[in-house]
Amino acid sequence: MSKRIAVLMGGLSPERDVSLVTGAACAKGLRDAGYEVVEIDAGRHLSQQLADADPDVVFNALHGEWGEDGLVQGVLEHFGKPYTHSGVLASALAMDKQKAKDVLRAAGIPCPEGIIANRFEAAKAHVMKPPYVAKPNAQGSSVGVHIVLEGANRPPAELGSTAWALGDEILIERYVPGRELTVAVMEDRALCVTEIKPNTTFYDYEAKYTAGGSDHILPAPISAEIAELAMDLAVRAHRALGCRGMTRSDFRYDSAADTPLWLLEINTQPGMTPTSLAPEQAQYCGIEFSDLVAWMAENASCRR
């Protein structure tokens, strides 16, 4: 008898639309793999939704606040339901970009220096000498990211806007020039290295989730030494935060710099849309999408 899997999607964060696409793709992949699937648009009555669905396993396809910051994971722990991706602590740590980087630096992984600032103060005057990146400390998918280039007279005015709904805590981080690289990790296995060439100013929300928004080159045209280093750092980051299942680590690479690779971010619930990087790397390594989501479901766990 096949397992009954509830796929959590949608949710309440600004990344809801992306999560719906990820969830639909994962639900189809799981059905193709032979599982019974129930799709849940996760809302404020998630406890009742889970009770009604009564799944054997929960596939967490949520993105952003509430879905990948440890909160939903805590609910699933309470109900004793095995779930995919990282647990409560790793999810909460990774979602807090600055705290995650404190842990990663302690593990010897190079990350750009940054400071936490109130968004209203950061909108009035530079709190770090440009160039720097200003972004919400606890959002994903490059939502609300601003690059402040050298010579800029003022910070982004949007940070002080009344329309801003991404939290008052801003991470101001040194801008690292170079090429965009990313590595997906399946438990202790780094898949490969992809170079991302966005067709916008940087790899923003539009570039990530719009067809044609970016070009993905895999394997990345880099030396074997740098590829090995990127994959090693991605696995070390995965372990340092106590992650499980699948993660994706994003890097900047500058061959002329003393430190050629900087880890920008680790994503504990990488996108699984048709344009997403992690499933693309898995397929390059010979893992079909249905096999990938089946592996994630079979490796789901609780209280880890």
Swiss-Prot record:
GO terms for molecular function: ATP binding; D-alanine-D-alanine ligase activity; metal ion binding. GO terms for biological process: cell wall organization; peptidoglycan biosynthetic process; regulation of cell shape. Its EC number is 6.3.2.4. Residues 101-298 form the ATP-grasp domain. The keyword Protein biosynthesis does not apply. It is found in: Cytoplasm. ATP binds at residues 128-182. InterPro entries: ATP-grasp, ATP_grasp_subdomain_1, D-Ala_lig_Van_CS, D_ala_D_ala, Dala_Dala_lig_C, Dala_Dala_lig_N, PreATP-grasp_dom_sf. It is an enzyme of class 6 (ligase). Its main location: cytoplasm. It comes from the Bacteria. Mg(2+) 2 binds at E265, N267. Disulfide bonds: none annotated. PANTHER family: D-ALANINE--D-ALANINE LIGASE, D-ALANINE--D-ALANINE LIGASE B. Belongs to the D-alanine--D-alanine ligase family. This is D-alanine--D-alanine ligase. The gene is ddl.
